[in-house]
């Protein structure tokens, strides 16, 4: 049995969050809807493998996402860093004790993002 993964972020910052993930990870809109009481977007990676999706859902409450991190494995972390605009706040890359290299970002909602190379 095959699975894919979809993670949902509910936020009052729908447009800003959608634009952030499209800009940083070159994601594409897989689905988008906008009705009076239901608004959101599902983003996918451009490669079309459909193994992971990110749903950004419009909500009135700004949630506390402390303790949550979204982790993206990069084939070449140095090349990824070079694609980032200078205004993107970041920390690293940092070598971790197990040999992987981590770059730390934070999305508009305070969700911790780790982009890493090496390991699983």
Roles of regions detected by a PLM:
Residues 6, 25, 114:
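Short catalytic micro-motifs in class I SAM-dependent methyltransferases
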Residues 5, 39-41, 68, 99-101:
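Residue-level marker for the onset of beta-strands and adjacent loop->beta junctions
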């Amino acid at each position: 049995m095959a699975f894919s993964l979809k993670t949902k972020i509910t936020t009052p910052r729908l447009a800003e969050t959608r634009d952030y993930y499209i800009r940083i990870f070159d994601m594409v809109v897989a689905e988008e809807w906008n009705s009076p009481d239901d608004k959101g977007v599902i983003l996918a990676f451009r490669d079309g493998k459909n193994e992971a999706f990110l749903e950004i859902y419009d909500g009135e409450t700004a949630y506390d996402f402390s303790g949550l991190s979204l982790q993206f494995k990069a084939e070449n972390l140095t090349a990824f860093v070079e694609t980032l605009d200078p205004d993107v706040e970041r920390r690293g890359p940092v070598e971790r004790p197990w040999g992987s290299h981590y770059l730390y970002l934070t999305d508009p909602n305070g969700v911790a993002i780790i982009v890493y190379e090496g390991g699983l």
